[in-house]
């Protein structure tokens, strides 16, 4: 329990992208230079209210306070432009005053000289000079009146503010349009320090919200949106959903065990798996393994496999008691028969899960490690603790009563399974044909399954942070920003800037989803009239450009430049394709490197690492299990009949997901591992009991029918318990968890179906064929 309290949730990109991957290293260097993902502050209200003297004073205090905070890299907004305009206006006023004075003195000197040449006295010369000064003043009167109309360049002067905000026609001036999307909103962009942890990024947002809570803007609503808030909302949603749904799942499991597993201590298996899960998560806490979406999915597999271990041991014990054995004899027989069989299933599954450690995705590696550890703990608990509790509870009860109770509990389900087993064996061919048809269909449509790794589509759609973000996108008209990092010895040379300008122009024309492009080439070409000038002019432009404009575009040593493409909101799959095309189309000059960076690039990269590698992971996992079974069984038939159903169920699940419309997401992408674990165990248990019955002298058909009726009760109880418990997930408001619940129910049901209907007939047919061949 103390270890569980140490668990921390990780839902950011650290769970999806290895810090050693190229894109993660590139992104870290980019953020070190240009800061992290921007925090957007949306000011909603009439522009006159937003830019009132009182509110501008608050915004000025905000910039002063947060600009001096080491957590913030840069702040850009309308106030930034107003302050630059004020500085430029003050400089212009001083220059105008100096120009006016110089022009007046020059005109006065010329007038005085002309008067002297005409023989005028000193008084007449002074009058001529005064007249010349007045004429200069009159000539510049329009400019003077305009300056007087605007007044002193100050944030306390509404006329000056209006002159910066609006053009001559009264529309928002071009320089302000990037921060004022319409007449009722304004934007402030705050770039936090790069490479902050999720908690630090969230705190940076909270600090901003706290400032505006304590310094409210008059008549203006302030909304702060950021990726950090979305990550926090996802984390909270996962936690809250899992807590409620897990409680409901346990309640449903209790009901199913009560009605289907009619033995003494029928809820003991649930207690055992609960303890196993608690110990596993506690160990995670001590080892510092975070809770991610994948590790939450692992809980499903642990409960499914763990409860099966306990039910199988408990079921075999009840079977031996029903045969009239003493408690000690029943316990020994149960353990001696089930220990190796379940041990084989355990070993094969562990090896399969360990292979997940080759994944590039951190949370998949943690997923595999947690599963391997968890099922070992579940096995140990079922083997020792469950038997100890049952022994202590039953040893004082008369064996006759225990036998009667065990016999009564075994009757109904076993009779149903006996009939089902005979039916499956009698109709092997048709069942096999249908199974193969569905498997082929699943293999075909598997490549057609839609992919969705966009957290926004997978989380509860009514989450305030998501609603705010979508409202802001609608107002701003931008769905996201694709960022690229350009590196060279000097990115400010005409050759590099010329290529960068052409690259941006071509991207805008080739990809309609790109709304605008921003780069160092944009700044230079705009200042130079639409062209890239020679190096001296470039240096002069960069020297005169305010640092607030250059900060997100150029590093101090001129070796790195940032490029950003504002795009419409498109699915992550399309974003991934766009990034691939942008990289292919770059064709940079020699010595220039282009690398994708930023949250969209990181998110898109997970599609290949998580979803794209899904089939590879499944094949490696299956291959590892095959090797283990080969070492253990050393019989090709047993190995094939254990592996084939696993592959078939994976294909069936793909077909069902395609027909239902469930996409591949970070959770459903690991469903293959769940199927491999559950189905492998079911088949190993069935094959183990089948071989046991054959050793007792039963012919193949009778041996299989007995195996289905005996092992099938425990398998069916396991499947129904898992189905009922995790069917509750379907009610989740978290789209990703809901889809995972549906996929889990489908996978467990199909694993049960193939174990008791498809494979028994094939196994019996194969053994009968071997007998016939041997008798010839």
Which functions belong to the PLM regions below?
Residues 1-2, 28, 332, 380-439, ...:
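Interfacial helix-loop-helix hairpins and adjacent transmembrane helices
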Residues 7-10, 16-17, 22-26, 32-40, ...:
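Juxtamembrane segments of multi-pass membrane proteins
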Residues 122-263, 498-501, 505, 542-625:
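Extracytoplasmic
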Residues 236-291, 358-362, 616-665, 731:
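Interfacial segments of transmembrane alpha-helices in multi-pass membrane proteins
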Residues 240-244, 270, 309, 322-359, ...:
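Pore- and gate-forming transmembrane helices of large, multi-pass membrane proteins
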Residues 256, 343-393, 626-630, 652-663, ...:
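Hydrophobic, glycine/alanine-rich multi-pass transmembrane helices and their short helix-loop junctions
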Residues 257, 274, 290-311, 354, ...:
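Hydrophobic transmembrane alpha-helices
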Residues 280-399, 731-732:
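Hydrophobic alpha-helical segments
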């Amino acid at each position: 329990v103390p270890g569980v309290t140490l668990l921390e949730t990780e839902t950011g990109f650290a769970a999806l992208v290895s810090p050693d991957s190229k894109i993660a290293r590139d992104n870290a260097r980019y953020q070190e230079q240009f800061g992290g993902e921007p925090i957007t502050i949306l000011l909603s209200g009439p522009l006159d209210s937003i830019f009132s003297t009182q509110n501008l004073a608050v915004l000025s205090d905000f910039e002063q306070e947060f600009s001096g905070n080491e957590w913030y890299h840069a702040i850009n907004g309308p106030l930034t432009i107003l302050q630059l305009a004020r500085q430029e206006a003050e400089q212009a006023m001083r220059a105008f005053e100096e120009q006016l004075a110089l022009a007046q003195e020059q005109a006065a000197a010329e007038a005085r000289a002309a008067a002297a040449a005409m023989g005028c006295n000193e008084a007449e010369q002074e009058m001529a000079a005064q007249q010349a000064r007045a004429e200069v003043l009159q000539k510049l009167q329009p400019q003077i009146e305009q300056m007087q109309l605007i007044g002193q360049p100050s944030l306390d002067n509404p006329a000056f503010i209006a002159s910066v905000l609006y053009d001559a026609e009264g529309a928002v001036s071009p320089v302000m349009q990037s921060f004022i999307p319409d007449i009722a909103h304004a934007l402030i962009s705050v770039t936090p320090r790069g490479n902050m942890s999720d908690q630090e990024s969230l705190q940076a947002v909270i600090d901003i919200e706290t400032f505006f809570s304590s310094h409210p803007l008059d008549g203006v609503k302030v909304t702060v949106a950021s990726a950090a808030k979305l990550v926090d909302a996802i984390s909270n949603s996962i936690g809250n959903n899992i807590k409620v749904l897990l409680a409901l799942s346990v309640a449903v499991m209790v009901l199913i065990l009560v009605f289907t597993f009619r033995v003494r201590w029928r809820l003991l298996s649930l207690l055992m798996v609960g303890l196993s899960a608690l110990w596993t998560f506690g160990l995670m806490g001590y080892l510092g393994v975070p809770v991610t979406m994948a590790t939450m999915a692992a809980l499903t597999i642990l409960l499914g496999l763990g409860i099966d271990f306990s039910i199988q041991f408990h079921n075999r014990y009840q079977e031996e008691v029903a045969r009239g054995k003493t408690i000690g004899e029943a316990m020994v027989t149960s353990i001696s028969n089930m220990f190796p069989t379940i041990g084989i299933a355990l070993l094969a599954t562990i090896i399969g899960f360990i292979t997940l450690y080759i994944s590039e995705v951190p949370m998949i590696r943690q997923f595999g490690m947690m599963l391997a550890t968890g099922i070992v703990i579940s096995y140990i608990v079922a083997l020792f603790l469950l038997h100890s509790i049952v022994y202590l509870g039953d040893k004082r009860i008369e064996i006759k009563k225990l036998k009667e109770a065990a016999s009564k509990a075994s009757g109904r389900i076993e009779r149903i399974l006996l009939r089902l087993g005979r039916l499956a064996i009698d109709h092997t061919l048709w069942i096999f044909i249908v199974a193969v048809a569905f498997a082929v269909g699943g293999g075909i449509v598997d490549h057609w399954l839609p992919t969705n790794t966009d957290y926004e589509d997978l989380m509860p759609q009514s989450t305030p942070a998501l609603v705010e973000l979508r409202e802001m996108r609608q107002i701003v008209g931008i769905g996201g920003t694709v960022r690229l990092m350009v590196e060279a010895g000097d990115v400010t040379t005409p050759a590099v800037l010329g290529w960068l300008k052409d690259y941006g122009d071509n991207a805008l024309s080739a990809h309609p989803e790109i709304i605008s492009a921003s780069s160092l080439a944009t700044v230079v070409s705009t200042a130079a009239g639409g062209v890239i000038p020679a190096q001296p002019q470039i240096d002069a432009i960069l020297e005169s450009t305010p640092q607030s404009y250059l900060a997100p575009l150029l590093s101090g040593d001129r070796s790195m430049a940032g490029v950003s493409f504002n795009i419409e909101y498109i699915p992550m799959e399309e974003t991934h394709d766009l990034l691939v095309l942008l990289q292919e189309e770059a064709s940079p000059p020699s010595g220039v490197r282009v690398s994708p960076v930023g949250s969209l690039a990181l998110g898109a990269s997970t599609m290949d690492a998580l979803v794209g590698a899904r089939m590879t992971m499944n094949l490696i996992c299956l291959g590892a299990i095959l090797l283990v079974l080969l070492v253990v069984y050393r019989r090709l038939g047993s190995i094939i009949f254990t592996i084939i159903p696993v592959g078939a169920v994976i294909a069936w699940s793909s077909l069902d997901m395609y027909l239902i419309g469930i996409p591949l997401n970070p959770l459903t992408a690991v469903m293959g591992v769940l199927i491999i674990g559950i189905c492998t165990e079911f088949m190993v248990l069935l094959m183990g009991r089948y071989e046991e019955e054959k050793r007792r002298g039963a012919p193949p058909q009778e041996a299989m029918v007995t195996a289905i009726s005996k092992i099938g009760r425990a398998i069916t109880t396991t499947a129904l318990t898992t189905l009922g418990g995790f069917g509750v997930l379907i009610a989740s408001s978290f789209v990703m968890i809901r889809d995972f619940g549906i996929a889990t129910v489908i996978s467990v049901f199909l694993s049960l179906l193939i174990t008791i209907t498809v494979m028994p007939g094939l196994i019996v047919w194969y053994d009968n064929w071997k007998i016939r061949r041997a008798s010839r």
